[in-house]
């Protein structure tokens, strides 16, 4: 199941409109591409069935091959509130978000992950509710300007491994 979408924004005018919604962080307007990870607002039967039909058609399998799996998911999500369904979808979007950051690093593209933005205002600007979506995270992509980026020459600081990782043996 892939209960989220990625919206790619390269239009400078639209990025300028997003900037105040995202605390005027310069990466919004300076990026070549801004990705918005937006999760489904709820996990309804229609969306799940459409996704499963697509998966099975791509695998050349009959749709009824694993109906028990789909029914189990329907039963599970039927017990969730709309808010719980959204939170599940948002967690799935975060997994994709992490993969996008790793892919950008592999390609040598600078990436700035962001959660500091007004989600409701961004959703309204991009008309996400009309698509059954809610914004989760932003990922600004591009190449940093080594001359003007004050962080470029500073050491990247992360917790030492022995403080970050808890080993249980």
Across the structure, where does each feature detected by a protein language model lie?
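Short proline/glycine-enriched turn/loop segments at secondary-structure junctions
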Residues: 124-130, 153
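A glycine-rich helix N-cap at a beta->alpha junction
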Residues: 27-32, 36-40, 128-148
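Glycine/small-residue-rich phosphate/adenosyl-binding loop
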Residues: 1-91
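Small-aliphatic-rich amphipathic alpha-helix that forms the alpha element of a beta-alpha
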Residues: 6, 71-125
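Short His-Asn-centered micro-motif
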Residues: 9-10, 38, 114-116, 141
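Acidic, glycine-rich active-site loops and adjacent beta-strand->loop/helix elements
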Residues: 12, 41, 117-120, 145
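C-terminal helix-cap and adjacent tail motif
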Residues: 43, 134-169
């Amino acid at each position: 199941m892939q209960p989220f979408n990625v919206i790619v924004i390269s239009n400078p005018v639209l990025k300028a409109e997003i900037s105040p919604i995202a605390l005027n962080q310069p990466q919004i307007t300076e990026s070549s591409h801004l990705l918005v990870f937006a999760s489904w607002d709820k996990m309804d039967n229609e969306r799940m069935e459409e996704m499963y039909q697509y998966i099975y058609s791509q695998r050349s399998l009959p749709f009824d091959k694993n109906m028990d799996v789909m029914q189990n998911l329907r039963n599970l999500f039927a017990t969730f509130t709309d808010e719980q369904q959204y939170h599940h979808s948002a967690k799935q979007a975060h997994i994709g978000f992490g993969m996008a950051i790793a892919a950008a690093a592999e390609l040598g593209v600078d990436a700035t992950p962001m959660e500091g933005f007004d989600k409701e205002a961004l959703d309204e600007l991009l008309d996400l509710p009309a698509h059954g979506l809610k914004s989760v995270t932003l990922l600004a992509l591009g190449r940093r300007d080594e001359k003007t980026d004050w962080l470029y020459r500073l050491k990247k600081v992360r917790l030492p491994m022995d403080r970050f990782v808890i080993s249980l043996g």
